[in-house]
Amino acid sequence: MKMLDLYGYTSIAQSFDKICISIASPESIRAMSYGEIKDISTTNYRTFKVEKGGLFCPKIFGPVNDDECLCGKYRKKRYRGIVCEKCGVEVTSSKVRRERMGHIELVSPVAHVWFLKSLPSRIGALLDMPMKSIESILYSGDFVVIDPMTTPFSKGEVISESVYNQARDAYGDEGFIALTGAEAIRELLVRLDLGAIRAGLRSELESTSSEMKRKKVVKRLRIIENFIASGNRPEWMILTVIPVLPPDLRPLVSLENGRPAVSDLNHHYRTIINRNNRLEKLLKLNPPAIMIRNEKRMLQEAVDGLFDSSRRSYVSSRAGSMGYKKSLSDMLKGKQGRFRQNLLGKRVDYSGRSVIVVGPGLKLHQCGLPKKMALELFKPFICSKLKMYGVAPTVKLANKMIQSEKPEVWDVLDEVIREHPILLNRAPTLHRLGLQAFDPVLIEGKAIQLHPLVCSAFNADFDGDQMAVHVPLSLEAQLEARVLMMSTNNILSPSNGRPIIVPSKDIVLGIYYLTLQRAQAPDQEVMSFGELSHVEYALHEGIVHTSSKIKYRMQRCNSDGTIVSEVVETTPGRLILWQIFPQHKDLTFDLVNQVLTVKEITSIVDLVYRSCGQRETVEFSDKLMCLGFQYASQSGISFGCKDMIIPDTKAAHVENASEKIKEFSIQYQDGLITRSERYNKVVDEWSKCTDLIARDMMKAISLSDEEGKLNSIYMMANSGARGSASQMKQLAGMRGLMAKPSGEIIETPIISNFREGLSVFEYFNSTHGARKGLADTALKTANSGYLTRRLVDVAQDCTVVEYDCKTKDGVVARAVIEGGAVVATLDSVVLGRVAAVDTYNPVTEELLLSAGELIDEGKVEKIRVAGLDAVRVRSPLTCESKKGICSLCYGRDLAVGDLVSIGEAVGVIAAQSVGEPGTQLTMRTFHVGGTAMRGVEVSNLIAVLDAEVKLVNSNVVTDKYGNQIVMSRSCEVVLLDSVGNEKMRHSVPYGAKLYVSDGQPVKMMDKMAEWDPYTIPIITEKTGTIKYVDLIYGVSINEVLDESTGISNRVVIDWKLHLQGANLRPRLVLLDEDGNIATLYNDLEASYFVPIGAVLNVQDGQKVHAGDVITRIPRESIKTRDITGGLPRVIELFEARRPKEHAIVSDVDGYVEFGKDYYRSKRRIFIRPVDKSLPAVEYLVPKGKHTIVNEGDFVHKGDLLMDGDPDQHDILRVLGAEALASYMISEIQQVYRLQGVRIDNKHIEVILRQMLQKVEITDPGDTMYLVGEHAGREEVMRLNRKLEEAGKKPVAYVPILQGITKASLDTNSFISAASFQETTKVLTEAAFSGKEDPLYGLKENVIVGRLIPAGTGFIMNKVKKLAMLDQSDYATYYNSELREIMGDLGDELIAEGEAASPGRSGDGYLGNGGGVVDY
C-alpha cells in the first residue's frame, strides 16, 4: 500500500508484517542506484558548489536546495518534476539526497569481507576450503585450479605462483585453467552445484562413524541447507558493483575555521574510486601481471575497509597519519552504533532537567515545576491559547510576549498545565517506576519539587540528584500518562507486590515517636477520656503527653454492622494516628495500638490497599506523611556522642574470648588441631564475642533514662528510620572482624568501637574492607547494568497474549527451608498464583481451590488452616501459549494486585525486577564499612518447637563412648506435629553425634545432634586393625611439620606428581582378627579411599573401634559472603555456565560401587541400577577429590556423588525442567535473600522460560532436521502435530538450557539480535540464510518505528486486524480474539453495531456504530 507524500513522490506506509534480509545481487544494486560515480570530486573549492559526476553529484542524488536545479534555471515549486536540460538535475525536494543511492562499477570483482571473514567463513563452507587458502588466493597472489584438464592437479587445488609458472611451461596456456584473486573465487562459486553437494553430504552423514567428522559434515550441511532455502546465488558474495550511500548520510560539514569535516565513508569511497580508475587505465596499457595483481589486491583491501575496517588483514601504511576510519560495520555496532544510539535510544524534545528538592506540601500525584521551566516546556500550548483568545494576533507576537513574561502569559500558563500531566524520570532508570507521571504545580525557584514518598521508587535523595521532565504532547500520550503512569497508580512494587509508596526516614521516626508508650509510675493515675476532643484539649494544655498511658472509650463496628463501644488502654499519640485511618471492618484499632516500626507501617499500608482500594490508600499515605513530619520535628530527637552507650560487660567478654583463643593456640601447639582448624575456631570465637557485646549494648541502649525518655539512636535504629544493629555495634560495641580484599577474614578483630576511637593498627586493618567496598562499587555497577541489559534482551518478546492456554500442567509450590528455618512460607510462595488442579483439605476433603482459580489472601488463609505443605500451581514455565504467556499461568500482576491483563510486557518487568536489585546491591557493599558479615558456623541441631522426631536414612554405629554416630550421607531429622504433619526437615551430616531416636518426642531447645563444622571425617563402621595400602612416604603421604608447634601431621599429598605414583590407589583398609579385610554390612570390603589434603588420625597397624575417626579432611577457611560474591553467582546461573569443578550427578537409582582401577588419573565409580537387567553406569571422579558417597550406598536419580555445585545442564537432563527451575530459583533467591531483597519467583520463571525455548533433535523422524541440531520448541511441536496427523514419524528431542546471552542471539528476530551484540555476525548469518523477521518482539518494533505490541499497542494491533477483515469474519474473530480482552465494552459495541444495521453481524463494531478506529 503506497501513500502519497505532500511533495507528490510516494513513500511506503508502515503496512508490512515482516522484514526479510538477503544478499543483494548486482542487478538489484544497479536497480536501486540513480547513476554511476566515476569521479572523486566533492565540492568546488572556490564556489563551494557540488561537482557534477562526483561523490555528491546533484544529477545522480538530487538537488542541494529545495526545488532548485544546479545552474539555477528552475527555481520554484511549480517546476517540480522537470529535469533541467542544461545541468541535468531534477527539480524536487532536497530530501531525496537522503534516499537516492549511486553505485560504482568495479573493473575487477571483489570478495565481500563479511562472507569471507565472519566465522564460520561462508565462502569457505560452500567451497569446502580453509579460510587461509582463500585469503592467500585473494591477497597473496596464489592460484586456484578451476579445471585441471590433462594435468595431475585436482579441481580447487591451491598452487603457488612458481608452481603455476612451471605447470604453464610444461602444459601450455591451454593445458589447464587456474586463476587468482576474486575472479578465481567467483568462478568456483558460479560452478557450484549446491543440490549435488547437499545430496553428497547427506549420504556421507549416513555412512560416517567418526563423531568428529559427523560434526564437521553437519556444520557444513546446515550452512548449505540454509543457503539453498534463502534463494541467494553463491556468486553474489563476490561483488562486481558497490552501492554508494546517499550523500546526506555521509555529509560534508564546514567547521568554524572554514575547513571541511568529511565523513569517513567519503574517504573509503574516494580510495575505492581512485584504485578502480587506476586499475581500469592499467588494464588498457597491458602491463606485467604482477602490477595488475597488486592493484587488484589494493582494490580488495579498499572495499574491505569500506565494509568492515576491523576485519582487514593488513594495516594501512598511512594508518599512523590518517588514523582509523570508521567503516559501515562500525556505524552499526556498539553503543554508539546506529541500532543502539539512534534507533533504540532517541533524544526527546519538550524536555528539561533540574535539581530536585523535597516537597512535603505536595499531594502524592503532584510535583513542583519551576515557572521558568514550565513556560519553556509548554511554549507552543501557550502560543496557541494566546492566539485563540486574541491576546496575540500572530505566533511571533505570542513568542515575544512569552519572552518578556507579560502578566497574561502566567494566567494562560496556569490554564494550560491544568490536567496536563508531565513525566519525571531519574537516571539510572532501573525499573519502570523510574519514570512516573505527575500533575505539575507551578513554584518559584529553579528546582523541581518531588513528593517524599516516591523517592524510594526513583531511588532518589536530595543530595544534588537531578531529574528530567518530559511533556506528553498528544492526547493519547496524556491519556496513557494519566491512566497508567500516574504516581498514584504505582503504589505496589512490580517485583514483589508489596507497597513501595511507604514512609521512610523521618516520617517513620515521627510515627514511631507518636505511637510510643511511656512507662507509668506505680502511684500515677491513668486518665480516662470519652471523646477525642477532650484528649486533644488535654494534649494542648500539657496535661498529658502523646506517649502517656490513657483509657479511652472506643466505638467500633462489628462484622454484622452493629456499633459496640469498649474501653481501651492506649496513648493520645495513637488516637491521633487512628483519626487518619479510613473506615473499614478489616482496619481495627489493634493495628495502631502498638509501637509502629517501618515493618508494621508497611503492612498497614498494604492492608489499607487490599481492603479500601487505591484512592483511600493514596489519601491515607499523604496524611501519614504529614503526621510523620510533624511529630518528627516536635519530638526533638537528636544524635549525640553520649547516646552511644558502651556496655559495662565489654571488657569481660573480650577477656573471655582472649582466654579461649590462648587455649586454641595451646591445642594447636600440642598438635591436637591443625592450623586451619585453629584459624576457624579463632574466627568463630571472635564472632561469638562480637555478638555478645552487641547484644549487651542493645540491652543497655534500649533502656529509658531517669526521665523515662528513650535513647535517640536506639529509636532511629529500632523504628527502621536509619541505621541498623550492625552499625550501632560498630559505634558503641566492638567493630569486630574485618575482611581482607581477597575475602578472607583477618583473625585479629578490631576491639575498639568508633566512640572510643581506633588505634593506628586497627585503623589500618579496617581500611582494607572499606577500600574494597568503594572499588567494588565502581566495578560492580557496570556488571549489574550489563546483567539487566542481557535479561531485558532475552525476555523482551515475552508478553501476555491470551487469557488461558488450557494447560493441565504446573509446578509444585512448597515453603522454602534453609538450615532448618523457614525462610519463605508456603503462603508467600503461592499468593497471586493460579491453582493448576483441584486442591482438597487432606482431613475434611473439602474443596479448597478449584483448578484455574486465583489464590488471593483469603484462599491463602484457607491453605494455612488446612495445613497443606505443597500446592500445584500454574507457572510460566509450563505455559503452552504460542509467542507469549497466558494470564492464568502468570497469575497476579504484582503492581496491581489482580490477575494480569492481556498485553502486559511481563518479560521486561521480570528482567527489571531481577536486574534492579543487582545494581542496588552492588552499590551497597560498603555500607557496613567492610566488617566481615559472617555468621557463626552451625555445629549442632536444636529443636525449635515441641514435636515428634522421625529419622530418615539413619544408618548409625555406636562408638566406644556409647555415642550414636551417623554413617549415612543422606540422614534427615524430620519434626512432626501432633497430627503427623511435617513441620521441619533438617539434614544431619555424616559423622555427626545423634542424640535422638526414631519416634522420640522432643521439647523446644532440645539438642538433637552435633558435629564439627570444620572437618569432614572418615569413620570406621567396625572394630579392627588399620592397614595402610598404597600410602607411601614421600609419594602419597608426607609428614608435614608445623614450624610453630614442632608437631608433624601425616597428610595425603598428590601422588600423581611422582613417576612411581601413577597406579597407586591410596586407602586405609580395616582388618579383622584373622588379618583378613573386614566385610561391612553390605558385603563390601572395608576399605577407605583418602583424598588429597586429608589428615590421617591413625598409625599403620593401630587398633580402632567402630565409630572412630580415622581420617579428617579440613574444610576451607570460610570466606565472607556478600552480593560481591552474589552478583557473579547470579550471572553464572543465568548464563548457564558450567561450574569449574562441578559435582557429578547420578543418572539412575542404584547402588554405589567403586572401580578397582583408574582411568587417566580419574577414579571410576559405578552405579548399579536396581533393575539387574540394566547395565551399570560409569562415572569418572578426578583423583583425590572427596566423594560424598560410600561403597554400597543407595543413591537416587539426581543425587550428587561428590562435593561442589551441580551443573544446571545435568539437572535438566537427569531430572527435567521442573527440578532445574526449583534449583535455580532457590540458588538465585538465596543470593537476594542474603541482602534482604524480595523478588517473586514468577519473574525468575519467566526468564527461565526464555532460556528453555530451544530443543536438541535426537531423532529427526520424517523431517529434514539433522541429529544434534537445535530448533525452537514451538516450531518442533507444531511440526510433530502435522506429522502425527499425516501418519508419519515425529521428531524426537530433548530440552536444552541456553544462557541469556546465547538465547538473546538465537531469537527469531535478527533485528533484535543484531541490536544486542555481535551485530555484523548476526546480520551476515541472516543475509546468508535469507532470514525473515516476523516483528513479534518489542525491540524490533521500536527499531522499525511502530507501536510496540504490548499494552495499548497490543489491543490496537488486534483492532486494526479486525478493521482489515471481511465483514463476514468480524464476529468470529471478535469472539475468538477480542472478547476476553475488551469484556463488556466489546459486547456493547457489537450490539450497537447490530442495532445500527440489523442482520450484519458485528459490522457496527467499526465504522457506523462503534468508533474504535477513531480512538
Curated annotation (Swiss-Prot):
The record's annotation in NCBIfam families points to: rpoC_TIGR
On subunit structure and binding partners, the annotation says:
The RNAP catalytic core consists of 2 alpha, 1 beta, 1 beta' and 1 omega subunit. When a sigma factor is associated with the core the holoenzyme is formed, which can initiate transcription.
Give one GO molecular function term. Answer: zinc ion binding
Which Gene3D superfamilies does this UniProt record tie to the protein? 1.10.132.30, 1.10.150.390, 1.10.1790.20, 1.10.40.90, 2.40.40.20, 2.40.50.100, RNA polymerase II, clamp domain (4.10.860.120), RNA polymerase Rpb1, domain 3 (1.10.274.100)
Q: Which family does it belong to?
A: Belongs to the RNA polymerase beta' chain family.
Leading EC class: transferase
Membrane-spanning residues: none
Enzyme Commission number(s) of this protein: 2.7.7.6
CDD domains documented for this protein: RNAP_beta'_C (cd02655), RNAP_beta'_N (cd01609)
Would the keyword Metal-binding turn up in this protein's UniProt record?
Answer: yes
Q: Where does Zn(2+) 2 bind?
A: 805, 879, 886, 889
The processes (GO biological process) annotated in the record are: DNA-templated transcription
Q: Which residues bind Zn(2+) 1?
A: 69, 71, 84, 87
Cofactor requirements of the protein: Mg(2+); Zn(2+)
- The name this protein carries in UniProt is DNA-directed RNA polymerase subunit beta'
Q: Calcium: is it a keyword of this entry?
A: no
This entry's comment on the bound cofactor is: Binds 1 Mg(2+) ion per subunit.
Query: For binding Mg(2+), which residues are annotated in this chain's numbering?
Result: 461, 463, 465
Q: What does this protein do?
A: DNA-dependent RNA polymerase catalyzes the transcription of DNA into RNA using the four ribonucleoside triphosphates as substrates.
- Cross-referenced SUPFAM superfamilies: beta and beta-prime subunits of DNA dependent RNA-polymerase
